[in-house]
């Protein structure tokens, strides 16, 4: 008699944009990765260990604790070559630059045309609100 062993399925690797939110102050950190689940787990591990490279994010994590943080994927299946443009759109949408209400230190480098294309794509898919109206 032959037994078939089911191998555990590997999680699907998803590219996209993610958001880390401090629920205590509604500040956001936006990032992108060609493997968002792995990247979010890395952020969570670094914050737990007190070794995250974003000092403001680490400070608030230490102050409020893990229960006040949400780790979420916001846009999925973004082509690798377009990740930076979509990340920039998300930073814009969530006002996550430090001088506003967020943890991102800088805007990702991308040209304005790519930003507009990414913004329009998300708008057409109904994934973001139209800020023009």
Where do the model's predicted regions map?
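Structure-specific nucleic-acid interaction/processing domains
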Residues: 2-132
């Amino acid at each position: 008699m032959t037994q078939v062993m089911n191998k555990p399925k590997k999680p699907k690797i998803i590219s996209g944009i993610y958001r880390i939110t401090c629920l205590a102050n509604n500040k956001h950190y936006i990032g992108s990765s060609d493997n968002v689940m792995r990247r979010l787990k890395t952020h969570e591990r670094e914050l737990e260990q007190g070794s995250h490279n974003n000092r403001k994010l680490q400070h608030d994590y230490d102050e409020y604790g893990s229960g006040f943080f949400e780790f979420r994927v916001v846009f999925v299946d973004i082509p690798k070559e377009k990740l930076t443009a979509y990340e920039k759109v998300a930073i814009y949408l969530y006002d996550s630059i430090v001088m506003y209400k967020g943890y991102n230190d800088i805007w990702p480098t991308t040209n304005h045309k790519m930003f507009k294309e990414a913004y329009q794509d998300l708008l057409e898919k109904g994934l973001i609100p139209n800020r023009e109206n």
